[in-house]
Curated annotation (Swiss-Prot):
Lineage top rank: taxon: Eukaryota
Modified residues (Phosphoserine): 36
Entry keywords, A to Z: Phosphoprotein
Official protein name in the record: Small muscular protein
Gene, per the UniProt record: Smpx
One Pfam family hit: Chisel
Family note: Belongs to the SMPX family.
Length: 85
């Protein structure tokens, strides 16, 4: 039986929490965006056609649906038990 130093075991156990691909190039944190934004007119709100798409967002088939409209309609619905029909 060969005896291995205990320090090797501790070193291996300490590296368990390193995520996969952490040492690959470009795996660091993305660069921070600048805080300054170009001045826009406050009186003209942006419409849905003028909004820029979010980077990395997938384009799904079909019309764009506003989530708040669905939530408003859903809040107006009520449960009707089978006996009251």
């Amino acid at each position: 039986m060969s005896k291995q130093p205990i320090s090797n075991v501790r070193a291996i156990q300490a590296n368990i929490n390193i995520p996969m691909g952490a040492f690959r190039p470009g795996a660091g944190q993305p660069p921070r965006r600048k805080e300054s934004t170009p001045e826009t007119e406050e009186g003209a709100p942006t419409t849905s056609e003028e909004k820029k798409p979010i980077p990395g967002m997938k384009k799904f088939p079909g019309p764009v649906v506003n989530l708040s409209e669905i939530q408003n309609v859903k809040s107006e619905l009520k449960f009707v038990p089978k006996g009251e029909q």
